[in-house]
């Protein structure tokens, strides 16, 4: 039985908003992987660690945050889809205890969103950004190997997205 929910999307802010609503709806705890990383690595955040320690060390520390989630119960996680590249083996382990919800848009819309997306620092962009080839690769991996639910959110409002996600959860667990 899957004990947690995880929301993955290229729109991190939307994923975070949805995850908070799901946590409230199902009386679960909410966790943001990036906030967990920052908390466990005070005084450094992702950007400052990348500057001071380099990409490899930062990715190793990000992996440790994902690894922690294996021990959680009754929680909703929001994860940056960029972590899938560095932690695909861990995400496959998380799949056993997490109902993974993949929110996606039509490819053309996602490419436009990625081009327009702004990052707080160049370091965040280096860690979490995607080009068109990487977008398609991640989309294939997440959709075929990780996701329990795939919801096309192109043109949907937040309320419609919530309804679609809750319907997919109910369908998965075969409840009304």
Task: Please place each PLM-identified region on the residue numbering.
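Conserved substrate/cofactor phosphate-moiety recognition/catalytic segment
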Residues: 24-63
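Pre-Walker A (Motif I) flank of P-loop NTPase domains
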Residues: 2-5, 73-74
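Conserved phosphate-donor/acceptor-positioning beta-strand/loop module used by diverse small-molecule
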Residues: 94-117
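C-terminal alpha-helix
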Residues: 164-175
């Amino acid at each position: 039985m899957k004990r947690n929910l995880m929301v993955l999307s290229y729109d991190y802010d939307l994923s975070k908003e949805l995850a908070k609503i799901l946590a409230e709806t199902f009386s679960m705890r909410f966790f943001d992987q990036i906030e967990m990383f920052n908390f466990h690595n005070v005084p450094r955040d992702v950007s400052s660690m990348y500057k001071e320690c380099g990409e490899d060390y930062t990715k190793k520390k990000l992996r440790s945050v994902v690894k922690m989630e294996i021990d959680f119960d009754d929680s909703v996680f929001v994860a940056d889809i960029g972590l899938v590249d560095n932690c695909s083996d861990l995400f496959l382990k998380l799949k056993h205890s997490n109902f993974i919800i993949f929110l996606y848009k039509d490819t053309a819309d996602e490419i436009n969103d990625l081009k327009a997306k702004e990052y707080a620092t160049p370091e965040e962009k280096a860690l979490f950004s995607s080009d068109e080839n990487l977008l398609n690769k991640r989309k294939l991996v997440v959709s075929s190997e990780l996701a329990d639910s795939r919801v096309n959110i192109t043109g949907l409002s937040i309320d419609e997205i919530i309804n679609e996600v809750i319907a997919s959860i109910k369908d998965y667990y075969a409840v009304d």
